[in-house]
Amino acid sequence: VASRIDEILEQARAKLTRLPAADVPAALARGAVLVDIRPAAQRASEGEVPADFPALVIERNVLEWRCDPTSAARIPQAVGDDVEWVVLCSEGYTSSLAAAALKDLGLHRATDVIGGYHALKKVVA
C-alpha cells in the first residue's frame, strides 16, 4: 500500500512533463527559468548550481508568491502564465510538488528536473 505522500507525489507528477537533467541546457537556451528551491543549508552542503546553469534561488516557502504574475511579491521574471519554470530540489521529490503547485496557479509550463540537483551536477561533470 502506497503512503499518502506517495499518492500525492504521483498526483503531482501526473500534472507535469518532467525534464531530464540532460535537457536543462536546451530548456535554458529557449528561455526557461531554472529555480533552485533547496534551503540554504542544503545548498551549502551539496553545492550551488553550476554557473553554466543560471538558477534563481527561491526557497520553497515563498515560491508561489515569487512566481505568480499577479502577486505583489513576484519577481521580475514572473511576467505571465507562459513562463517555463523549471524547479530544482535535491533529488526531484519536493520539486515535483512545487511545480504542481505552480501549475495550480495557472503557470501551465511549470515542471521540475528528474533527479534534482544530484542529476544536474552529473550533466556538467
Description of each model-found segment:
Residues 1-33, 40-85, 91-125:
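Rhodanese-like catalytic fold shared by cysteine-dependent sulfurtransferases
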